[in-house]
């Protein structure tokens, strides 16, 4: 009898310990909400300050403007696609190949390029990587020259396609264009991720992910998506590439491309392409959780007027009337609450049994 009693106590203890780490107390893990420092407040590093301000001499300060004295690239706005550089103790614009330069233009052509006829061009005219080429251009391997991307040409990498396309089987295919239940070849960018679809890694077809927007604890709770901290201090399921459900994302990326062409911008920056850069930044903010849930950048994105109803980003019902993810979320929440109540009652009962066994 004594052995049976000990076994019952041990089993009950193990069960209670497992319950204490489960969903009964709300499995959605709490995330820390950070308090950012404003200009003039004491700091230890730039991550303590509101973006894009920096920490210098233990004080939050604005980034240094072009032409002002500096000590590091960070002071000049390193975050702007590395275009702000501290050159010989003065902040300057590090121009890319294809950018306007010379008289009437700020900045210095970057390493490996020179200013000719008011344009930054490669020293010997040859490129060695795609990153040296202007927007919508790639480094052609046979000629080592920057060539414009042409839709319809064969490709062997994504950079040979427009930014709105990816290279799939030597052909440029429009991103996010595959419908539900159609093949995606294991490439997540082919499925309509902004509409709630994901590329099933096993079957390699586009499938609806009804976990979008639901609370989570680990990535495994999100199907093919990932679990991230949101702005409310909780974890939430988003797409595998941190994508959010939002019906304006495709329009945003197309607007950005049109702007880059209309303004003849060669690189994406707030200094050399000031009209298009906010469109790009707002696209990233509205469509990707990695930016939308970045607490440090919250004030920065508000200054760009990127704010959107958060509900439309995390609630599929708001983004797509035909998507039933929202109702599934409510159903799952009710089921979760019911399970939690049951487990709490069970744990209390087991606790009472343990007390009685110990006493008697």
Curated annotation (Swiss-Prot):
This is Uncharacterized protein DDB_G0272420. One of its GO terms (molecular function) is receptor antagonist activity. Glycans are attached at residues 126, 241. The chain crosses the membrane at residues 340-360. Residues 317-336 are annotated as: Disordered. It is found in: Membrane. One of its GO terms (biological process) is negative regulation of canonical Wnt signaling pathway. The keyword Protein biosynthesis does not apply. One of its GO terms (cellular component) is extracellular space. It is a single-pass type I membrane protein. It holds the Pfam family DUF7107. PROSITE patterns: ZF_C3H1. Keywords: Glycoprotein, Membrane, Metal-binding, Signal, Transmembrane, Transmembrane helix, Zinc, Zinc-finger. Residues 23-339 are extracellular. It comes from the Eukaryota. Residues 321-336 have a biased composition (Polar residues). Residues 1-22 form the signal peptide. A zinc finger (C3H1-type) spans 114-140.
């Amino acid at each position: 009898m004594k052995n049976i009693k000990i076994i019952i106590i041990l089993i009950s203890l193990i069960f209670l310990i497992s319950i204490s780490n489960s969903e009964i107390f709300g499995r959605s893990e709490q995330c820390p909400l950070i308090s950012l420092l404003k200009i003039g407040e004491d700091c230890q590093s730039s991550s303590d300050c509101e973006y894009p301000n920096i920490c210098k001499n233990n004080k939050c300060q604005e980034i240094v403007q072009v032409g002002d004295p500096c000590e590091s690239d960070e002071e000049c706005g390193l975050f702007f696609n590395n275009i702000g550089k501290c050159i010989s103790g003065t902040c300057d614009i590090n121009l890319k190949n294809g950018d306007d330069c010379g008289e009437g233009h700020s900045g210095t052509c970057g390493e490996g390029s020179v200013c000719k006829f008011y344009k930054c061009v490669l020293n010997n005219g040859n490129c060695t990587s795609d990153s040296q080429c202007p927007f919508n251009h790639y480094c052609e391997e046979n000629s080592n020259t920057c060539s414009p991307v042409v839709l319809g040409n064969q490709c062997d990498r994504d950079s040979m396609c427009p930014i709105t396309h990816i290279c799939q089987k030597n052909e440029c295919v429009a991103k996010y264009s595959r419908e539900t239940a159609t093949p995606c070849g294991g490439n997540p960018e082919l499925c309509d991720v902004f509409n709630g679809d994901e590329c099933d890694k096993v079957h390699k077809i586009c499938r609806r992910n009804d976990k979008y927007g639901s609370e989570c604890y680990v990535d495994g709770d999100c199907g093919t998506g990932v679990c991230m901290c949101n702005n409310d201090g909780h974890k939430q399921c988003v797409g595998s590439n941190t994508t959010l459900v939002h019906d304006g994302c495709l329009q945003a990326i197309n607007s950005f491309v049109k702007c880059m062409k209309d303004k003849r911008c060669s690189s994406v920056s707030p200094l050399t392409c000031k009209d298009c850069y906010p469109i790009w930044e707002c696209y990233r903010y509205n469509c990707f959780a990695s930016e939308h849930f970045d607490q440090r950048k919250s004030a920065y994105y508000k200054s760009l007027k990127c704010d959107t109803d958060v509900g439309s980003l995390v609630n599929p019902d708001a983004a797509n009337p035909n998507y039933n993810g929202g109702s599934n979320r409510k159903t799952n929440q009710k089921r979760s609450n019911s399970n939690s109540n049951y487990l709490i009652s069970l744990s209390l009962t087991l606790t009472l049994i343990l007390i009685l066994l110990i006493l008697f």
